[in-house]
Design a protein with these regions (language model features):
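Short, glycine-biased loop/turn motifs at secondary-structure junctions and
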Residues: 1-372
Length: 372
C-alpha cells in the first residue's frame, strides 16, 4: 500500500491561531513587533485564568479606575459568581446603582491611548504593533466573550427574542470585560499609565459593571477547556464553568446540551443513527470515532487502491459522511505509522480522488509522496 506523507502527528494536529500577522516589513513595524513578541505570555495567561479572583487587588483597581476618570469611588463593590449572576442582580436589585460609567472608566482612556500610539507609530506602525500584540489574542478571546454573552441570554431569556432578551443584551454591553480585555490592553504600556487600573482588574478578576454608585464584579471561571484551535471543547462536563454553576457545554466549538454530553460515554451505532439533529449526530460520530463506527456497523469499503481506502457512512436526513483511510508515511517517534481518516466530499468515488482533493488536486494529477 502506498503511504502518503502528511507530516508528523504534531504537524497534523496544528496549533492555535489567534490573530493576524502584520502586513509589510517596514522598519517601524519590525521594531515594534520584535519588542512585543516576547511579552504576550502574561496577557494570554490572564485572559484564560481560572480560579478565585484576588478581590482586594481587583477592588483597588476598580477604585483607581474611577479616580483616574475623575469620578468619586463607588460607594459599594458587590461580588457575584458569574456574568449571569451579575445580570440577574442588576435586573432584580441595585435600583440605586446610578448611571453606567463604563465610557468614562474604560472607553475614554482606551481611545486616548490608542490615538496617542497611532499618532506616534503611524498607520503602518500601528497595524504591525496590533498584529504583534493584541491581534494575536483577539480572535480566541472574542469568541469566548461572544459565547458567554449568548449563554447568559439563553439561560435567562430562553427562546425569547423580544424585550427581555434586549434588556439582558444591554446590561451585558454595560460590562467591562476584566480578564477578557487582555487583548487590547496588551497593546499598550501597562505600568503607571492611564490604563494601569484596568490592567489590575484584568489580572485579578472577571467581568465587571461600573455604575455611578455601585460596582459589580464577577468571579473568574473555575474551569476552561479548549481545543488546539482555541474553541470551547470538553466531552466530560462543562467546557466553561463558573463557581455559581453557570456553565457552557461544547464539543469542538459547537454548543451542546449538558445532558447530551452525559450520554456520549454510552454511545452505540444505533443511538448515533437514531439522532435526528444532524449537527449533534456529527458530534457523536467524532466522539465515537469514525473508524470505530465503521467497524461496529459492519461497513464495507467503497473503493480501495494504493493511496488508501474509501469509506461511506449513510445518515438519515443528512448527506453521507465519506472518508479516506490513509497511512501516514512519516513515522511516529516509536517507529509506528499513524492511520488518518480524511473527510472528503460525498461525491468522491475513489480513494485516490479523495486524497487528491485534500491537496487541491485532480485525481490524475496526484502522485503519492512515498511508497513502502
Amino acid at each position: 500500500m502506498t503511504t502518503t506523507d502528511f507530516g508528523s502527528a504534531t504537524d497534523m494536529e496544528g496549533t492555535e491561531v489567534t490573530g493576524t500577522e502584520a502586513a509589510g516589513t517596514d522598519a517601524a513595524g519590525t521594531e515594534v513587533e520584535n519588542m512585543a513578541t516576547g511579552e504576550l505570555g502574561p496577557w494570554r495567561a490572564w485572559a484564560s485564568a481560572t480560579g478565585p479572583a484576588d478581590r482586594a487587588a481587583a477592588e483597588a483597581g476598580v477604585r483607581r479606575a474611577y479616580r483616574l476618570a475623575g469620578l468619586p469611588e463607588p460607594e459599594r463593590v458587590v461580588w457575584v459568581g458569574s456574568p449571569r449572576a451579575a445580570v440577574t442582580l442588576l435586573r432584580e436589585d441595585l435600583a440605586d446603582r446610578g448611571a453606567s460609567v463604563r465610557d468614562a472608566v474604560r472607553s475614554a482612556p482606551w481611545a486616548r491611548q490608542r490615538r496617542s500610539l497611532y499618532t506616534e507609530l503611524g498607520a503602518a506602525g500601528w497595524s504591525a504593533h496590533w498584529a504583534a500584540t493584541g491581534g494575536r489574542l483577539w480572535e480566541s478571546t472574542q469568541a469566548l466573550v461572544d459565547r458567554i454573552r449568548t449563554g447568559v441570554i439563553e439561560d435567562l431569556a430562553g427562546r425569547d427574542t423580544g424585550k427581555e432578551a434586549a434588556e439582558i443584551r444591554l446590561l451585558l454591553l454595560d460590562a467591562v470585560l476584566g480578564q477578557h480585555d487582555a487583548p487590547w490592553l496588551a497593546a499598550f504600556p501597562a505600568d503607571d499609565g492611564p490604563l494601569d487600573a484596568l490592567t489590575a482588574v484584568c489580572r485579578h478578576a472577571g467581568w465587571w459593571w461600573p455604575y455611578a454608585r455601585v460596582a459589580v464584579l464577577s468571579e473568574r471561571p473555575v474551569a476552561l477547556h479548549r481545543d488546539e484551535a482555541g474553541r470551547l471543547d470538553h466531552g466530560d462536563g462543562p467546557a466553561l464553568a463558573y463557581p455559581d454553576a453557570f456553565a457552557l457545554h461544547a464539543w469542538r466549538g459547537m454548543p451542546v446540551p449538558a445532558e447530551f454530553l452525559a450520554g456520549l460515554a454510552t454511545l452505540t451505532p444505533e443511538r448515533i443513527r437514531a439522532e435526528e439533529n444532524a449537527e449533534l449526530r456529527r458530534v457523536m460520530l467524532e466522539y465515537y470515532g469514525y473508524d470505530r463506527y465503521l467497524t461496529d456497523s459492519g461497513a464495507r469499503p467503497l473503493h480501495q487502491d494504493e493511496t488508501g481506502t474509501l469509506w461511506r457512512i449513510d445518515l438519515v436526513d443528512d448527506e453521507p459522511v465519506v472518508m479516506v483511510e490513509v497511512l501516514n508515511s512519516t513515522p511516529e517517534p516509536d517507529g509506528t505509522r499513524r492511520t488518518y481518516w480524511l473527510r472528503v466530499p460525498p461525491s468522491t468515488r475513489t480513494a485516490r480522488a479523495g486524497v487528491a482533493w485534500t491537496f487541491g488536486l485532480a485525481a490524475e494529477a496526484y502522485a503519492p509522496a512515498a511508497e513502502t
